[in-house]
C-alpha cells in the first residue's frame, strides 16, 4: 500500500466530525496548558496573592476540572456533543477572559469594589464547569465516528494531539508573556476558545446516529459513583495513587515559585515545564516496547520510584547550582538550575510513561468481574483528588519552607518523603491484595 492509499484509508476510517473534534481539542489544550503553566505565578506575582491562597485557588480550578467530567459526560450524552462543545468553548472563552481581566489595568477600578479572592473562586469554578465538557465530548465523538478497525488508532490520534497541545501551548504562552505580559496569556487562551466556539457552530456536525446504548443519566452516574467509592479496596488504591499525582502537580505550583524566586522571574518556566510533554511525544513508543513484558504492578511501582527519585535529585543537586551559569547549545549564560530542573522533570516523565499505559490494565484487574468498564470510567479520580489537595499542599509547603524559613530545599525533601510513603503503601497494597480479585 503506497502513501496515498494509506492516507485515503485513514481518511475513510473516520467521519469528518472526528477530525473537527480532534483539531478543536488541540486548540483547547493549547489554551489550557498555555495558561496552566503560568497560573501560580499569575496569581502570586501579578495579583499578589500569598502562596497559600494561590495553592487554594489552583486546587479549586484543577480539582473541579478533573472531577466534573464524570457528570458532564452524562449531560453531553443527553443534549448532544455539538451543544456540549458550544457550551464548553463559550464558557471557556468567557472564563479565560475574566481571569486575565483581573490583572489588566483597564479593569482594576471595577475589581477594586470586590474581594478578588472570592471573585476568582467564582470565575475559576465557572471556567472549570465549561472545561469539564471537553474531554467527554471529544472521547464520545471519537467512539462514534471511528470504524471498528480504526477505533484504536482514533484514540491514539486523540492522545497524541493532547500531548502536542501540552508541548506547544507553554511555548506560545512564553512568547505572549515575553512580548505582552502574563495577563495576556489568558486573553490569547480566551481567543483560542472563542475561535473553537465558532468552529463548532460552522464545522462540527453531530456524529451519525449509531449512538451508544444504555446512556447514563445523572442519577445512574451517581449510583455508579456510589458503587465505586464504596469499594474499599479500589478507593484505597485511588488514594495511594493520588499521592503520585500530588507530586506531579508540584511542577505547576512549587517549581514556578522556586524558579521565579531563586533563579529568575524572567526564566522561561513555560519551556521548563513543557519538557514532560515533549518527552512523552518523543519516548512513549520506545518506552512502551521496552517495558511491555513488565507486569502492571511493577510498571506502576517503577513510575512511583522515578517520581520519588525526581524530588530527591532536586533536593541534593539544585541548591548547589545557585549563582552558576553555563552555555547549552544556543542557550547562552543560563542558570545551571534550569537544566537541572528540566532533567528532574524528564526523570519523572520516564516513570510516568512506564506506568500510565498499564494503569488501566491494573484497574481492570482490581475491578469485580463484570464491572471493569465501570471502574475504568472513574480511573482519573486520583488526578482530581490530587489537584483538589495538591495545590493547597504545594502552596503551604512553599510558604512555610521558602517564604518564611528561606530553606526551599526542604520542600523537595518533603515531596521526596511523600513519594517514599506512596511507594511503600503501594508495595503493601500489592502484597495484601496479591491473591485477591
Predicted regions and their residues:
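Juxtamembrane intracellular "pre-TM" segments in multi-pass secondary transporters
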Residues: 2-15, 210-239
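Extracytoplasmic gate region of multi-pass secondary transporters
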Residues: 32-40, 232-270
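Loop-to-transmembrane helix entry
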Residues: 49-63, 118, 153-156, 260-279, ...
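Central cavity-lining transmembrane alpha-helices of secondary-active solute carriers
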Residues: 59-74, 274-287, 385
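Glycine-rich segments within core transmembrane alpha-helices of 12-TM secondary carriers
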Residues: 65, 152-177, 192-193, 379-392
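Helix-to-loop junctions at the C-terminal end of transmembrane segments
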Residues: 68-81, 177, 282-302, 398
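C-terminal ends and interior cores of transmembrane alpha-helices
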Residues: 90-115, 306-333
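A membrane-interface helix-boundary motif in multi-pass transporters
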Residues: 114-117, 175-192, 396-420
Amino acid at each position: 500500500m503506497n502513501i496515498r492509499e494509506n492516507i485515503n484509508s485513514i481518511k475513510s476510517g473516520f467521519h469528518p466530525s472526528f477530525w473537527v473534534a480532534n483539531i478543536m481539542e488541540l486548540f483547547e489544550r493549547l489554551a489550557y496548558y498555555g495558561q496552566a503553566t503560568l497560573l501560580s505565578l499569575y496569581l502570586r506575582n501579578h495579583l499578589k496573592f500569598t502562596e497559600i491562597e494561590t495553592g487554594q485557588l489552583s486546587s479549586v480550578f484543577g480539582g473541579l476540572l478533573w472531577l466534573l467530567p464524570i457528570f458532564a459526560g452524562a449531560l453531553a450524552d443527553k443534549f448532544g456533543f455539538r451543544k456540549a462543545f458550544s457550551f464548553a468553548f463559550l464558557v471557556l472563552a468567557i472564563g479565560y477572559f475574566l481571569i486575565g481581566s483581573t490583572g489588566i489595568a483597564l479593569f482594576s477600578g471595577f475589581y477594586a469594589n470586590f474581594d478578588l479572592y472570592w471573585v476568582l473562586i467564582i470565575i475559576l469554578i465557572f471556567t472549570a464547569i465549561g472545561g469539564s465538557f471537553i474531554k467527554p465530548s471529544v472521547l464520545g465523538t471519537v467512539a462514534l465516528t471511528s470504524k471498528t478497525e480504526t477505533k484504536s488508532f482514533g484514540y491514539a490520534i486523540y492522545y497524541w494531539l493532547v500531548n502536542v497541545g501540552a508541548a506547544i501551548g507553554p511555548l506560545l504562552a512564553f512568547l505572549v508573556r515575553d512580548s505582552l505580559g502574563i495577563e495576556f496569556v489568558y486573553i490569547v487562551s480566551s481567543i483560542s476558545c472563542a475561535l473553537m466556539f465558532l468552529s463548532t457552530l460552522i464545522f462540527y456536525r453531530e456524529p451519525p446516529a449509531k449512538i451508544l446504548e444504555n446512556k447514563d443519566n445523572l442519577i445512574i452516574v451517581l449510583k455508579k459513583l456510589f458503587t465505586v467509592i464504596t469499594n474499599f479496596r479500589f478507593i484505597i488504591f485511588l488514594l495511594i495513587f493520588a499521592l503520585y499525582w500530588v507530586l506531579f502537580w508540584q511542577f505547576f505550583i512549587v517549581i514556578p515559585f522556586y524558579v521565579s524566586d531563586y533563579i529568575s522571574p524572567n526564566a522561561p518556566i513555560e519551556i521548563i515545564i513543557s519538557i514532560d510533554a515533549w518527552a512523552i511525544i518523543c519516548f512513549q513508543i520506545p518506552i512502551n516496547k521496552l517495558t511491555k513484558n513488565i507486569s502492571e504492578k511493577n510498571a506502576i511501582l517503577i513510575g512511583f520510584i522515578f517520581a520519588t527519585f525526581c524530588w530527591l535529585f532536586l533536593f541534593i543537586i539544585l541548591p548547589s547550582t545557585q549563582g552558576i551559569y553555563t552555555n547549552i547549545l544556543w542557550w547562552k549564560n543560563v542558570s545551571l538550575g534550569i537544566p537541572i530542573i528540566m532533567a528532574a522533570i524528564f526523570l519523572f516523565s520516564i516513570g510516568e510513561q512506564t506506568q500510565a499505559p498499564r494503569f488501566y490494565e491494573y484497574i481492570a484487574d482490581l475491578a469485580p468481574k463484570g464491572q471493569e468498564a465501570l471502574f475504568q470510567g472513574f480511573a482519573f479520580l486520583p488526578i482530581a483528588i490530587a489537584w483538589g489537595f495538591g495545590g493547597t499542599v504545594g502552596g503551604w509547603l512553599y510558604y512555610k519552607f521558602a517564604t518564611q524559613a528561606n530553606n526551599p530545599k526542604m520542600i523537595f525533601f518533603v515531596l521526596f518523603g511523600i513519594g517514599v510513603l506512596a511507594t511503600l503503601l503501594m508495595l503493601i497494597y500489592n502484597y495484601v491484595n496479591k491473591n485477591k480479585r
